[in-house]
Amino acid sequence: MSAQTKSKTEQNKAVTEEQANDGLKESRKLFLASSFKDVAKLFADFTGEELKGKSVTFIPTASIPESVKFFVSSGRKALEKLGLTVDELELTQATGEEIRNKLEKNDYIYITGGNTFFLLQELKKTGADKIIIEQIEKGKTYIGESAGSIIMSPNIEYVKDMDDCRKAPELSDLSSLHVVDLYPLPHHTNFPFKKAVEKIRAGYGEQLTLYPISNAQAITVKGAEVRVVGK
């Protein structure tokens, strides 16, 4: 391929990606939390919809390498309390067909906290990352908790002081789903992540658009509108 042809190809690719990103910005509806159980009412307010009887694809995969997993059951119970039917999808155990079917058929997508690096590794291995982006582009509401919020950013390298990247030995590329241009920073002021959050803010605060949120807060995204809600 000649330099001129290559340059033109790259330009065309850039235009396509920019257009796709613009389309995503128009359709996206995201609720990004640190601790969902603490902000479940804010989610109900955010949707403005009757939640009873609706279904949510619940992905707990990020919790697999973690020794502490209470947040998985807490998040599930909070969703059920809102009247949602929880349909679990564990990526490491599901077929490609099961992953696509569940992500497409349910009304919402929810990804729990856990190890962000392991989560991204499994999303990429299974192709679930692309399907989730497709569903967000079609207007489906996405709910993220901690690691599930972080993966919406362009790249997850910034949380290496919060999560152990060694838990994802097959992950070589830290570029993430890039549904938002900002970088969620969960558990701001909350034990046991307070020191890690401050270290990330000190190291990346001038380079990245960090959005620190406590367990009582969430980042809401509707189209181009981004807000932090909660106390």
Language model features with spans:
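Bacterial Sec-dependent signal peptides at the C-terminal "C-region" and cleavage site
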Residues: 3-5
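N-terminal beta1-alpha1 cap of cysteine-dependent amidohydrolase-like domains
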Residues: 13-108, 112
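Structural detector of well-ordered beta-strand residues that form the stable sheet scaffold
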Residues: 31, 142-143
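Short, glycine/serine-rich, charged loops/turns that create anion-binding
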Residues: 37, 63, 115, 156, ...
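A generic structural signal for short coil/turn motifs at secondary-structure boundaries
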Residues: 65-67, 118-121
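Active-site-adjacent pocket-lining segments in enzyme domains
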Residues: 112, 120-141, 148-231
